C-alpha cells in the first residue's frame, strides 16, 4: 500500500494516567496526527490507538473501565492497539499488584493472555533506567531494533501464558518480556517508555505509525 500521501490518525487514550504530552510529541515526531481523547466513540475511526500509563494496575483498570468495551472491540476489529508501560500491563489478563495491596483480583483487558508478576523479593525495585532490548521474534514494532537500549521504570513485568507472545526481552536478574503482542499481531505493548528512550524510542513509535498506515 502506498502510504506516502497519508497521515496516520492516532488516538491517545486519556484515562487520567500517562505521559500524555511526551507521548504526543513522540508520535507527532513520527509523523502521526494525534487526538487526545476520553471518548470511546473516537476509537473506531482512528488508524491506531495508544494506551499510555504510569501508576498502579488497579487504578489504571478502574480509570479505563469506561473504555474497556471499545478497546476490546477495536482489537477484535484488527485495529493497531499499542500499550505503553502500565498500558502494556493492562493488555494482560490480571496482575499480582492488586493482590499485593489487598485489592483482590483486578481483571485486565485480557487481550494478551497472561499475568503481571512482581520482581523477586530482594531485587531492587523499581527497575529504573536504561536496559538492552533483545528481539525474540519478528514483528513490525521491532523493525530496525535489536540490541538497542530503552528506558524502563517498573516493579512488575508481564508473564504471558504463551511464550509466542514475547516479541523482545530484557534482563534484570531475570529475563522478562520488554515487548509483547497478541497472536493476530495488532495488539502489542512495550514495558519501557519509547517517549523517553531517545532515537530507539522514536524508531519504535515510527514503526507503530508505519504499521497503522500499512494495515
Curated annotation (Swiss-Prot):
Subcellular location: Cytoplasm
Disulfide cross-links: none
Domain Glutamine amidotransferase type-1: 9-215
Xref: SUPFAM superfamilies: Class I glutamine amidotransferase-like
Catalytic activity of the protein: 5-[(5-phospho-1-deoxy-D-ribulos-1-ylimino)methylamino]-1-(5-phospho-beta-D-ribosyl)imidazole-4-carboxamide + L-glutamine = D-erythro-1-(imidazol-4-yl)glycerol 3-phosphate + 5-amino-1-(5-phospho-beta-D-ribosyl)imidazole-4-carboxamide + L-glutamate + H(+); L-glutamine + H2O = L-glutamate + NH4(+)
Task of the protein: IGPS catalyzes the conversion of PRFAR and glutamine to IGP, AICAR and glutamate. The HisH subunit catalyzes the hydrolysis of glutamine to glutamate and ammonia as part of the synthesis of IGP and AICAR. The resulting ammonia molecule is channeled to the active site of HisF.
Protein name: Imidazole glycerol phosphate synthase subunit HisH
Organism: Natronomonas pharaonis (strain ATCC 35678 / DSM 2160 / CIP 103997 / JCM 8858 / NBRC 14720 / NCIMB 2260 / Gabara)
Lineage of the organism: Archaea, Methanobacteriati, Methanobacteriota, Stenosarchaea group, Halobacteria
Amino acid at each position: 500500500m502506498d502510504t506516502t500521501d497519508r497521515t496516520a490518525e492516532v488516538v491517545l487514550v486519556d484515562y487520567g494516567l500517562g505521559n500524555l504530552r511526551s507521548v504526543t510529541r513522540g508520535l507527532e515526531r513520527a509523523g502521526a496526527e494525534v487526538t487526545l481523547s476520553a471518548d470511546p466513540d473516537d476509537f473506531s475511526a482512528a488508524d491506531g490507538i495508544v494506551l499510555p500509563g504510569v501508576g498502579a494496575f488497579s487504578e489504571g483498570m478502574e480509570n479505563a473501565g469506561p473504555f474497556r468495551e471499545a478497546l476490546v472491540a477495536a482489537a477484535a476489529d484488527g485495529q493497531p492497539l499499542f500499550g505503553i508501560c502500565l498500558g502494556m500491563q493492562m493488555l494482560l489478563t490480571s496482575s499480582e499488584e492488586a493482590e499485593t495491596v489487598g485489592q483482590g483480583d483486578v481483571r485486565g483487558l485480557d487481550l494478551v493472555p497472561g499475568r503481571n508478576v512482581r520482581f523477586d523479593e530482594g531485587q531492587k525495585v523499581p527497575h529504573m533506567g536504561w536496559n538492552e532490548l533483545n528481539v525474540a521474534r519478528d514483528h513490525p514494532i521491532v523493525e530496525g531494533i535489536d540490541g538497542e537500549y530503552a528506558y524502563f521504570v517498573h516493579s512488575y513485568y508481564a508473564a504471558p501464558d504463551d511464550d509466542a507472545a514475547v516479541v523482545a526481552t530484557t534482563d534484570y536478574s531475570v529475563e522478562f518480556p520488554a515487548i509483547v503482542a497478541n497472536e493476530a499481531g495488532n495488539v502489542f505493548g512495550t514495558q519501557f517508555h519509547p517517549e523517553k528512550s531517545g532515537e530507539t524510542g522514536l524508531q519504535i513509535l515510527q514503526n507503530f505509525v508505519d504499521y497503522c498506515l500499512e494495515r
